[in-house]
Amino acid sequence: MKSIKREKLSILTNFCDKNGEIPDFGTTLLGKEFTNSLSEEEGLFLNYGQRNSAFPYSQQNQYGRELKQKEFLSVTLENEYLKAVFLPELGGRLYSLFDKAEKRELLYKNSAIRFCNLALRNAWFAGGIEWNCGIPGHSPFTCSPVYAAVDEDENIFRIYEYERIRGITYQVDFSLPSGSRFLHCRSRIVNPTNNVTPVYWWSNVAVRTGGNNLRVVAPTNRAYTHHNYNVITVPVPEYDGIDITYPENSPVAVDYFWKTRPDAPLYMAAVDGEGKGLVQLSSSRLKGRKLFSWGNGKGSDHWQEWLTHDGDDGKYCEIQAGLAPTQYESLPMPPNTAWEWVELYGAINLVPEKIHGKYTDAQSAVEEFLKTALPKDYAENFLRQTAALAKKPLTDLICKGSSWGALENLRRKTIGNRPISQHLQFTETDDGVDDWKNLLLNGSFGEHNPLVAPKSYTTQTEWINSAEKAIRGKDKNNWYAHYQLGCAYLADGQIKKAAERLLTADKLVVSPYVKCVLAQAYLSQGKKNKAASKAIESAERAPDNVEVCQFAAKILFQTEYYQKLYDFTHCLPEKMQKNPRIRLYSAFAAVEIGRAEEGEKLLNLNGGLCIPDMQESEITLGELWFKIRERKAETTGEKYTRKYSDIPYKFSFQMTNER
């Protein structure tokens, strides 16, 4: 028995399909690099392929906290033992994997799709299995539609996309064969370019914790982690006085990348106190395995509640599988190459004593289970047997992704090159590639209204070369061409060249968007006064645009011009002043210029300041709370000592040791 079904699924969500208007290049364009204390035998590609932003992808930051019911397209694969539910409009996320025999959910299934700021594009949501390809961090498509197609005869559900930062295509073919107790996930990445490119893949699996004595088992006795960005190896299972294979033992948020044994099958299992849980097995290419624990602090608890519907979905951890040994790196992928692998996900049910005793006994128990559940070398054999099927075109397209794959094929056609991944159907959708098509076919971007936000960007070398040619010809006096080049240079770290193009654009037209990016260029050069001036100018040109005004306030906050920030926010319309981010910056400014009581009032107004897109690792609310107490203590001559444990729960987002 097997079936594939598509239907609408109603889920609570704060989903917003409107993207941000201002491109993001990271805070300072200077990301933190990893050092290491590893032996020369480790051979990690540390820092290779790391990025500071998701540019040219737009930010997905226009959501609030209010949840409403919304219907999402879902695809369900089902057989006698398992039921798998996917969401193609949200990166192809595996939303649920249900064990029919035990009548239990194998994943952490979030009752709400609640966007929060944990990804390079901002929006991310917890739960299920996420398929992360391209750049380090969460997939650029994790909260976006991807291409999805079905083949009911073969019982295959396929997701795929063109990832334009790396210039690669990826696809995952999902199947649930009749009689199988494992969901089959067959992945394929193709580098169709003539260049070596950094490639990143991690399958991110959320599993429930919260008092269930969950233990994570993998074929390892060492793990990679980092202390203050210095990568080290630590023993498994005992490290620093705790058994790190139990996620709930960790006092703080932490990543452990299991150093898998070369002689063992590549698996990971998350098994609770009753001996029940989820097991994953892969073919040989997918060597990396990871455990992420949120830790046990107040801030960690708050984050898990923040990601759910009022915290009523409980706690979770993540077990992950990747191409590289760690997420501190990408792997160099040769030109014109395909990488393929298979993952299998299913239920595991063992005697609890075998799992919750010696770690070597737990490993043996899982490995014996896999030997019994699957034929020898099953994953490798399945990979070979489905090689032709993976290149079969699927014509029943049920969800469309971006237009960039179709645009790349058009670009290739004009120079006589073959299309990318010819068995994958890429179409044109309404996501703003017309500018680039015009550049390709006519040698010009054409005219653009400087008061309307540009819809799309790129950093691909071929397009940048075309834009550079355009400003020497038809687009010499076209602000938009200079602006696009300025953005591309800034993303590439060519800050001087970026500033030159952006200054040219700023002289040609009055555009708040040019001024916003120019402010970021100045900030990255350390020219704080110029950055602040351009930020204020951007808001003056778009006084009714909340995003532009919020951006201006952010730049003034980053440059620490607190009096200017205070004056700026207090000149905004009352409705604009209520924006959570603007209110936060205004409160900081008030405290820094000696108005601590005013800052405290802004912080506590209406039950306390709530920032919908509070960023992972951001502690601005706690910092503001501390500063208010320090300023008050100064006025009375008292000494104030910071203690993270004192921060009220609603303002607590730190994931470090509380002291």
Regions found by a protein language model. Name each.
Residues 78, 84-102, 159-210, 218-222, ...:
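Acidic, contiguous internal or C-terminal segments within carbohydrate-active enzymes
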Residues 475-476, 509-510, 543, 577, ...:
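Short coil turns that delineate tetratricopeptide repeat
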Residues 2-44, 75, 89, 96, ...:
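A contiguous, surface-exposed recognition patch within enzymatic or periplasmic domains that forms
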Residues 75-78, 86, 148-150, 187, ...:
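Short Pro-Gly-centered flexible turn/kink motifs
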Residues 35-78, 126-182, 211, 299-328:
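Extended, loop-rich substrate-binding clefts of extracytoplasmic carbohydrate-active enzymes
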Residues 480-484, 513-517, 547-551, 580-586, ...:
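Alpha-solenoid helical repeat scaffolds
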